[in-house]
Amino acid sequence: MNIAVKPVTHVRAVNWNRIEDEKDLEVWNRLTGNFWLPEKVPLSNDIPSWATLTAAEQQLTIRVFTGLTLLDTIQNGVGSIRLMEDAATPHEEAVLSNVSFMEAVHARSYSSIFSTLCSTPDVDDAYRWSEENEFLQRKSAVIMEQYRSGDPLKKKVASVLLESFLFYSGFYLPMYWSSRAKLTNTADMIRLIIRDEAVHGYYIGYKFQRGLERLGDERKQEIKDFAFELLLELYDNEAKYTEALYDGVGLTEDVKKFLHYNANKALMNLGYEALFPGEACKVNPAILSALSPNADENHDFFSGSGSSYVIGKAVATEDDDWDF
């Protein structure tokens, strides 16, 4: 089969000294300043507390992280790439390339957790489960449909709902364990992921709002109706996914409140009003406390915890330097 390839006749080099939208540089600096890798987080310190979880709790944790891996895989391989097609400037495209890479880092992070804490058969079972779970596959299909739609604004709506809403049924569990002094180093890494996703959702939501500015009132209302309808469709599925995961440990209602809270956050990123009333968004205070970037950090030599780290600088020494 012959595939016609349009020749590239004109390419514009990205010039960071001439910024068309200052938000691009602001977010670029934030994302690069936040750069991290899972290999720097001491996950092995969580092996003792992992052993205190029941078999059912371990299975739940592995499945939750596998579900998150699937969403990160979509964002890395499809979502960010589709958004780059609509980038208004080379700087926006560069920021989205960073977003894509960090989604790959996030997916890699869950594999680091698995290889450190879990047995290979248990992990393989979870990956099979992710391919067969109807609710996980359904939300993936809904998001993928919008990424393939060709509508730049609808793609951004889908991306913000994934980044700022769908991830959080999974993020709840490591925060829950952390609030009980379990898997604290794993929670530190999840907080690094949450920090990234917060910037991603904010930035893509900002670009969405900039796109809306160029539309007439009728088209704006059409997009708003679409956003709320898509959120409700995803929420209905996410509630069922949450029930299937968390009913066995009695956490379903708490997780749903967390979902309501973050659904409203996603709408805020899009510039819309909240959908769920305050009463439905009363998240367990222990979970909100665990979400804080400094929740478990004491940076002592015994804990090893910390949701940030510093890459050390090597300094050359000689034997005489060690004569005290």
Where are these regions (language model features)?
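Non-heme di-metal
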Residues: M1-F324
